[in-house]
Amino acid sequence: MAYPIFKFLFYPFNWAMIKRIRSTENIPDKTTFILVSNHERRVDSLYLLYPILKKLDKKLHIITMPTWWFLGDAICRQWAACIPLFNKEQAYNESKELIKSGKIVGIFPEGRLGKKEKKLKTGAVRLAIETNTPILPIGLKSSYVPFNSTLNIGKLIYPKKGKNVEKQTMGIMKEVYRLRDNI
């Protein structure tokens, strides 16, 4: 069972915070995938984890800034399934190994919260191409107000080798924003 404490503590929290989750049938149950979403609030990872955990009972390994690493590796990496972004190469390689072993990895191509990058991060597309893994786009309207957050889950996207990685990343994020705006 993935996240036994999460199910006990955070299922009620997410139930109270998320108004609607659309298109959960698009979450593949027999395929490893890379989850890509927009990033609006600190709780976004919890909101994204909720439908994955309910449908698949699997951990979602999300690339995060190393803010909480004073709690220790056991809590952050093993229990919470975070991938610390100490440096780009380390996070990329760790994500790649997790994907190759059948795990689900979550990435926010916009960069860190509160710092909207003009240039999107291309790691999700590069990982998808290198590991031959599809991307699951999720549009998220995130809120701290109860019954106000919504998720819209898109269909799998298969990035193409040999095509411009930046353009593919932009196309995936346009789909994420379309999903977010059409909830």
Question: What are these model-predicted stretches?
Answer:
Residues I21-S23, C82-N87, P159:
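Short acidic-hydrophobic, aromatic-tinged amphipathic segments that line or gate anion-handling sites
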Residues A2-I18, D73, R77-C82:
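Short hydrophobic helices that act as membrane-entry/anchoring signals
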Residues T31, Q90-I183:
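Non-catalytic C-terminal accessory region of glycerolipid acyltransferases
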Residues N14, K55, R77, L98, ...:
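A generic structural signal for well-ordered alpha-helical segments
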